[in-house]
Amino acid sequence: MNRNGLFSATVSLIAASFCLGNSLPVQAETCQALMPVGGNNTTVTKTVSQPSIPLFGPIGLNNDWNTDFIVESNAKYKNYKVILLPTSNGEYSIRTYLKYSDNTADNFYDQKPSLTANKPLVITGFPRSQQQPYQVNVFVGDLVSLGKGYQVTVEGCR
C-alpha cells in the first residue's frame, strides 16, 4: 500500500471510531397493541361496504367505516401507531383521530393514498402535551374505498 493509501485508511478509521464513540445510545420504543371497542382481538379485519339507510328513515347513513381503539386511562404514551394492512390494491380514504374526554379530537392523518396489498401503512400520531386521548379512531371509507379490504391494529408507544 502506498503512503497516500495508508493515510486515507488511517483517517477513515479515526473518523469511524470518533463517530461510533460519540454516538448517543438508541433507546428502542416499546409499544402495546390497543383493544378495539367491543372487540376481543387487537387486529380488526374489515371490507369497506356501501352505507345503508337506517331502519327509522334517512336521518343519516349507517356504515362500518369507523373503528375505535381504547386507550387505558392510566396510559402515558408518547405516540400512537396505526398499522393498516391493505388486502386489496388501490386508493383508500383514511382519516385518523385522537379523541379526548373534553369531546374534542385531533386529526393526525387525512389522505387518500394508493396502497399495495400486504404492504403496511404505518401512521404515527402524537397526543397533546398535557392530555392523553381515551380513544384512537380509524376511519376507512368513501366511494373510492368501497369493496377494499384491510386489517388495522393500533399501538400505544412509550
Question: Where are the predicted features?
Answer:
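Beta-sandwich interaction modules
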Residues: 60-73, 115-130
